[in-house]
Amino acid sequence: MALSLAIIIIGGLVFNKAFDRLSLPGLLGMLFLGILIGPYGLNLISENVLNISSDLRTIALIIILIRAGLGLKKDTLIKIGGSAVKLSFLPGILEGSAICLTAIYIFDLPFIEAGMLAFIIAAVSPAVVVPSMLNLIENQKGKEKGIPTLILAAASIDDVFAITIFSTFLGFHGGKNINISLKLLNIPISVLLGILIGVVTGIALIKLFQKLHRRDTKKVLLLLAVAILLTVLEKNLTTIITFASLISVMTIGFTIMEKYGNLGKRLARKFNKLWVFAELLLFVLVGAQVNIDVALNAGFLGFLIILIGLIFRSIGVYISLIGSKL
């Protein structure tokens, strides 16, 4: 296990730098490394690491979502509120619907399986979007119109839509009797509950940090542990109505930055450093899940489905921003 982590870290740093030198995204290098050393490649990652791969990827995602929350500003959110709401569901629904129909006609998939495929592909990856948007914010690009904040906010809610619709199709596939209306109603409720829980948790942590004077590193660890507990809680809930834990995580960071700005700025710097390691783990382990033979077998038709999805997502983005100044 220790050797596997060493290979992931050293290889990830090397491939990240190499792809940067080629003017390609560094994350592509890390994904390529994962494919190369994963179980479908050279098989250099131990079974122990692969067994906890899902948990490691979740922790990495939590780290970048906390950092995203620490990068949001209330004034900007108010300014782009309406556009963010439309952008959070229209592009994803259009993309998912287009991919679903295309998969039915091209791959002759049953409707339920096509729907599952569609909303796996349509889900936005915060781990890709968030670092790029934070980089734009730090470099003061798009700040006047709030474009990075708009995308940050929309991407997190987009995921809730995609996951909920995917889980609905998955339930049908498993033969479960699912109330579609209740599932759809759960989307806005889970988002609102996620925000509420995030605000309450953020305020509670602020009060705790103000009373217990500890090093910022310990505050980061406590914040990370609380965020992990929230995601575990959501996964284990069996109630009809749930909450969006990833939005809660993001909201905690936002609340700390708004209510305790000095601490928020210090924590943001800490999470930037933590993300360097988390990013390596996340993208290399994602790459390790890729069966390159299956991907190659999809060939041109697989590429066509993705292309059609992106075209309809672009149409959704355009519709969402009609009437705005963007």
Residue locations for each model-derived region?
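Transmembrane helical cores of multi-pass secondary ion antiporters/exchangers
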Residues: 1-326
